[in-house]
């Protein structure tokens, strides 16, 4: 029996509020993270991802208090990211109730951090987040580059090669966000999603650009992702999680109803 594909709502949290932007900019308010997380838990989300989108840029730590409140209300796996830079940061988040942590910029600056974190806490706890942007011109071999600091700083690192390296360093999962797609509602970048899914032996979560339920299906079928992440379509009630799961199941995709 195939493993069920997961649907993961993402809470981008800025100063204690859930927000949503377009291509990492133009932020609009979506509500209180604890209330939103509770709703998704009740609606049947498979997991929830909480990303403190200001943490790395402003050099402050993720709001432990909010994580504790969400963890006390939510009974599905919770991944927390944003400003995770040390083994102590990871321990703090796991103690606050997170099941996994997402490491982004810190992995780029110090890949051995991922290895140390995986050795200490287990690969199942460690998600490496990749913000990728297409840098090849039309007609060229497709190539995607890693950006850090909330998508503000280019690194020159090839996204597919980086994903393979991170899997080798002990990441348990890759959270792949297409910066070209983020918030645009035009669908995932299926090219980079498929390239990374095919290249690594660990699950890949597709993120960035969902505008309708067919995009979730495409992420799994065409992008070959193991899980699909979305934000605004759920936050602003364009669709509900049960609708998303029924739609995917109707297309022959195994999901937990």
Curated annotation (Swiss-Prot):
Its main location: cytoplasm. It is an enzyme of class 4 (lyase). Keywords: Amino-acid biosynthesis, Cytoplasm, Histidine biosynthesis, Lyase. The keyword Amino-acid biosynthesis applies. IGPS catalyzes the conversion of PRFAR and glutamine to IGP, AICAR and glutamate. The HisF subunit catalyzes the cyclization activity that produces IGP and AICAR from PRFAR using the ammonia provided by the HisH subunit. Belongs to the HisA/HisF family. This is Imidazole glycerol phosphate synthase subunit HisF. It comes from Cellvibrio japonicus (strain Ueda107).
